[in-house]
């Protein structure tokens, strides 16, 4: 059975594809999640995260942008943006424990983004969570 971390990793991939302009990615999400062996409760968890993030995208982007220091929002990489959006959604909307989400986001950044991303993502999500 997939873990929540694996489910979040898949959601980052879906958000990344969405950001690239594939707005129909939701139609294929079951197949994508199945490829990653994300099933049952974790699949439902993934759908909730993806759908909730997309539904709140404008507000999440505004919150992220508000907490950037010395960064232009448009200059943030797409992977980093996907991780920030997911983390902001879980902190602000899903009300998941802030420390857990920041840790998850940092771990996602370590495995999916460049070496400077974990610290950047930690700082932004920490500011959002306060």
From Swiss-Prot:
Zinc-finger recorded as keyword: no
GO cellular component: cytosol
Organism: Sulfurovum sp. (strain NBC37-1)
Role according to the record: Involved in transcription antitermination. Required for transcription of ribosomal RNA (rRNA) genes. Binds specifically to the boxA antiterminator sequence of the ribosomal RNA (rrn) operons.
Stretches that traverse the bilayer: none
GO molecular function, one term: RNA binding
HAMAP family hit by this protein: NusB
Protein name: Transcription antitermination protein NusB
Keyword Transcription regulation among record annotations: yes
Pfam families in UniProt: NusB
Gene Ontology biological-process entries: DNA-templated transcription termination; transcription antitermination
Taxonomic lineage from the root: Bacteria, Pseudomonadati, Campylobacterota, Epsilonproteobacteria, Campylobacterales
Keywords annotated in UniProt: RNA-binding, Transcription, Transcription antitermination, Transcription regulation
Recorded superkingdom: Bacteria
Family: Belongs to the NusB family.
